[in-house]
């Protein structure tokens, strides 16, 4: 499809699962069951949520869950592992400020959210310093009124991405943002609302599953490396770590492979 593409490797990941299914059909486990989950909508954070909320999930609820993601910048086929948090939790958040429009010749007759918006733009990126662990707030979009020179703005919005390596720290950062926005709104006589999209739980690896992945990598003759710090990006696989022991690991896509989400990225077939 012109202008469309899998720029994170989901097509390759699903192909790997297909290949695994074929191998398992030829060499079935002596005991137990293996569930191959072809989950949609990973990029929006809604896919895992929909799976877990489906009543039919109880029929396949696993004792342990494993997932991989290709990682450009690492040697081809290298297994990248980490104990504890593997990838950050994150959420998209929008603050909506509502005042009152007026003629631009008489701004005093309205309530313009410009000052509150400006103060929030300055203050919010500093809030992660108040969280005990790693946290990050990235402003991504701001909007004030409309391009009408005769009108003093009556509404504004500010959108951002919040992320942290600990779920509790992420919730703390959300509360800090809400409190700051409410304080600015009250000071300037504005109504404030909050919206959330693309929310991802922290991907936390079970310590008991680490040696299993390590041993399999050794048996397959694959290089394995321990990552010192969690990745800052997020995966909705993190929700599975809240319902069963789980383990997310990376698979090197090549040191010269373009980074994920870049227009030139293409999943290396050698990983399949």
Range-by-range predicted roles:
Residues 23, 98-100, 253-256:
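Short connector loops/turns at beta-strand edges and beta->alpha or beta->beta junctions
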Residues 23, 54-55, 183-184:
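A generic secondary-structure signal
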Residues 14-21:
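DPxDG-like acidic metal-binding loop motif
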Residues 25-29:
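Surface-exposed acidic, glycine-flexible loop patches that form ligand/cofactor-binding
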Residues 2-5, 11-12, 30-141, 145-151, ...:
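Histidine/acidic-residue-rich, glycine-tolerant segments that coordinate divalent metal ions
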Residues 19, 46-50, 108, 172, ...:
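Generic recognition of short, well-ordered alpha-helical segments
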Residues 115-272:
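Metal-dependent amide/peptide-bond hydrolase catalytic core
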